[in-house]
């Protein structure tokens, strides 16, 4: 998003555009995409699998989408090229499910180090807490991965969003005329 437009953005900044204005336009555009995608996924999943906690599931979908979107925007803002940003973002998104613990339990030695960075874990773990009690108990019985309370999950996903936005601002603010 940013890495591919770096040369144009630098010219605009030279002409007087503030980094916050550029970031604001990106955040507005991407927020609309996050909302549309999250509502679509929620409608699709809730239609076929209504197991309770609809609003909670929607909020976790929105936060997970926003976290990944804004972290990838941050990567694009600090990357040297669009290719580098794309590759790093693909790896980040691609490793979310295997490292979340939702499919396979991670070794305890690795889990504590990796878990704070995996948005998919926080959305999944928090979303599980909103299931109907019989479904929640059934899921809990087959899981090897520990679940975290929903409030903690909301906070961590909010921190992911904030870190992505902060990295984006830092990357946009820094001049890179060598391009």
Walk through the language-model features, giving the residues of each:
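Membrane-spanning alpha-helical segments of multipass transporters and channels
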Residues: 1-179
């Amino acid at each position: 998003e940013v890495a591919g437009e770096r040369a144009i953005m630098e010219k605009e900044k030279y002409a007087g555009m503030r980094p916050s204005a550029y970031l604001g336009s990106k955040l507005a555009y991407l927020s609309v995409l996050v909302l549309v995608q999250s509502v679509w996924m929620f409608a699709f999943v809730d239609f076929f699998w209504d197991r309770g906690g609809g609003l909670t599931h929607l909020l976790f979908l929105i936060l997970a989408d926003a976290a990944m979107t804004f972290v990838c925007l941050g990567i694009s803002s600090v990357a040297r090229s669009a290719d580098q940003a794309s590759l790093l973002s693909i790896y980040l998104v691609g490793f979310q499910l295997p490292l979340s613990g939702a499919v396979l339990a991670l070794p305890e030695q690795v889990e504590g180090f990796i878990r704070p960075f995996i948005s998919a874990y926080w959305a999944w773990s928090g979303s599980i807490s909103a299931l109907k009690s019989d479904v929640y108990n059934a899921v809990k019985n087959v899981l090897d991965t520990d679940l975290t309370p929903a409030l903690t999950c909301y906070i961590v996903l909010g921190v992911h969003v904030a870190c992505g936005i902060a990295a984006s601002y830092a990357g946009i603010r820094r001049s890179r005329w060598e391009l």
